[in-house]
Each structure stands twice: as structure tokens, then as C-alpha cells.
């Protein structure tokens, strides 16, 4: 039975790597997949989904007003049977788009695998994550580690001096080196201004296609 899955984590936990491996597993078995990526995420180039360890694949761009069920139906009409839809940076989905993806599962009987952050640098839910947590059939945390050794569940945005940034837009694409995954306890400390934190998780260079 097809299901809606949400794989969530803090920053730099390997979400995109996991997505690309899942897509590869489907293709290896002769099954066709569709990878969706938000237009505002163009770090690896428009329509390219790339992980920090160098894996990459072409994706179909969507915007905030893209009707995703219709997009999937057009893809099937043009290219034939589809066996899985995978969504990168799923936190940027709108409420309506999460519902549309649930329709892909329930009406078209196609599994949908969404990968994204749960919370932003203020510890608040993204819109897409909020409704995926509410409506997904299966939830799975992709774990990563805080510099303290505890499980990292939060993401902080730091300035050039390693101090927490508490204001600014929720969405800031690029500059991944400014984000650090930390435990809840460490998140509280740095947000209180107790010390500084180095952005240790530097993105690896992507290979040239």
C-alpha cells in the first residue's frame, strides 16, 4: 500500500544523500521515480539535487503555487508509469502542497517520500514540516550528532563570530556553513548568548558534471 513518508532531521544529517540513495534503489529495480525540488533551492544549480558527499541527480522544480498532484499526473501522461515521488527540502512545501502529495498517495497509489528539516533556526516548525508531521503515514528521524556528543535535534544560525542569529527571514538559501546542528540543551545556551559556536559542518565541494 502506498504511503506518505516524512524523513526529518536537523541540518546536515544526510537527508539529500538518503533521498538520492532511495531513488537509486528504485531505478536499480527498473522502477521510474520523480524527484521534486523547490525553485528557491538552487545551490547545486537549477533543477539539480546534490548531497554534500557529491551525489547528484536531476530534479523537477516546483514553486509555492505549483499544483503537485497535477504535476505528477502530467508526468505520468508524458512519460508513463511512475513508482515513487521523492521531495527534497520538503520543509518549503505549502500546506496545500502537502495535501496534494497525500492525494498522490491516496488517489494515484504512488508512494511519496519527503525529506526535510523539522524546525528553523528559531526552533519553530516550517509550514511544510508542520503538515507533514500532521498528515504523513510514516515519520522517521534521520539522526545526527551535536558537538556535545548528544543527539542534535535543533539548528542554529550563527554569524561570522559564532554567535546565534535570532532575527531575519526564516528561509535563507545557501551559506550552509552558517548553520550548525545542536542538541536542545546547546540550542538554549547559545540562544541565551552563553558562548559561541564554530560552524563545523562545512559543505564538501561538488564534482563538476
Curated annotation (Swiss-Prot):
GO cellular component, one term: cytosol
Main location: cytoplasm
Matches recorded under Pfam families: TK
Keyword Membrane among UniProt keywords: no
An example Gene Ontology molecular-function term: ATP binding
Localization (cell): Cytoplasm
InterPro entries, A to Z: P-loop_NTPase, Thymidine_kinase
Catalytic-site annotation from UniProt: 89 (proton acceptor)
ATP-binding in keyword set: yes
UniProt entry keywords in alphabetical sequence: ATP-binding, Cytoplasm, DNA synthesis, Kinase, Nucleotide-binding, Transferase
EC number(s) per entry: 2.7.1.21
Tree of life domain: Bacteria
SUPFAM superfamilies: Glucocorticoid receptor-like (DNA-binding domain), P-loop containing nucleoside triphosphate hydrolases
Reactions catalysed according to its record: thymidine + ATP = dTMP + ADP + H(+)
Biological processes per GO annotation: DNA biosynthetic process; thymidine metabolic process
Residues annotated to bind ATP: 9-16, 88-91
Principal EC category: transferase
Oligomer and partners: Homotetramer.
Family, per entry: Belongs to the thymidine kinase family.
Protein name: Thymidine kinase
Organism of this sequence: Xanthomonas axonopodis pv. citri (strain 306)
Amino acid at each position: 500500500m502506498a504511503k506518505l513518508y516524512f524523513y526529518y532531521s536537523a541540518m546536515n544529517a544526510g537527508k539529500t544523500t538518503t533521498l538520492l540513495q532511495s531513488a537509486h534503489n528504485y531505478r536499480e529495480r527498473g522502477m521510474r521515480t520523480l524527484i521534486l525540488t523547490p525553485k528557491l533551492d538552487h545551490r547545486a544549480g537549477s533543477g539539480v539535487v546534490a548531497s554534500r558527499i557529491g551525489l547528484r541527480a536531476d530534479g523537477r522544480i516546483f514553486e509555492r503555487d505549483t499544483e503537485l498532484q497535477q504535476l505528477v499526473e502530467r508526468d505520468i501522461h508524458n512519460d508513463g508509469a511512475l513508482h515513487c515521488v521523492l521531495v527534497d527540502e520538503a520543509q518549503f512545501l505549502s500546506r496545500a502542497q502537502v495535501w496534494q502529495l497525500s492525494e498522490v498517495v491516496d488517489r494515484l497509489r504512488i508512494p511519496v517520500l519527503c525529506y526535510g528539516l523539522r524546525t528553523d533556526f528559531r526552533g519553530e516548525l516550517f509550514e511544510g514540516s508542520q503538515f507533514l508531521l500532521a498528515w504523513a503515514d510514516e515519520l522517521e528521524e534521520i539522526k545526527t550528532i551535536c558537538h556535545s556528543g548528544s543527539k542534535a535535534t535543533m539548528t542554529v544560525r550563527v554569524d561570522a563570530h559564532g554567535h546565534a542569529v535570532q532575527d531575519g527571514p526564516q528561509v535563507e538559501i545557501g551559506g550552509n556553513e552558517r548553520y550548525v546542528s545542536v542538541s536542545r540543551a546547546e540550542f538554549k545556551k547559545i540562544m541565551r548568548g552563553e558562548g559561541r559556536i564554530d560552524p563545523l559542518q562545512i559543505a564538501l565541494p561538488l564534482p563538476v558534471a
